[in-house]
């Protein structure tokens, strides 16, 4: 059974391992933990204001993540959307459940617009966001409060 819950400190190592494995080994993204200090300090980076970091688990195994940064001005940024390869697809619906929880939390907390950045090579993710009502936008149309990641090439927006 898949459960989704807010981040707890004991999950840190499992989250880091999941995300780095997907980034480096599955998609050959040239990024290290040193460039993602947010993963070593999740509570202070994500769990303030109306932001949060959710973890999907199968039993005790971390199999997915999603994070919301509260940027102020009724703007939220989606980060760290990852699902372990063996748990992807409609059979599990983990990515959809994670996004639904994030959007529900955003609406409850008066966040009106969501933004995210991703990589061109992550075509399944791009299709997922488009199916969920996100619109591709130019980098220069991002709000000034959007936290840019150097590796991102595609940017999306959704009014909720």
Predicted regions and their residues:
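Acetyl-CoA-dependent GNAT
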Residues: 6-86, 96-101, 105, 142, ...
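Glycine-rich phosphate-binding loop
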Residues: 91-93
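Terminal helix-turn-helix DNA-binding modules in bacterial transcription factors
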Residues: 108
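C-terminal "cap" of GNAT-fold acetyltransferases
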Residues: 112-115, 119-123, 127, 131-160
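Extreme N-terminal starter segment of soluble prokaryotic enzymes
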Residues: 1-3
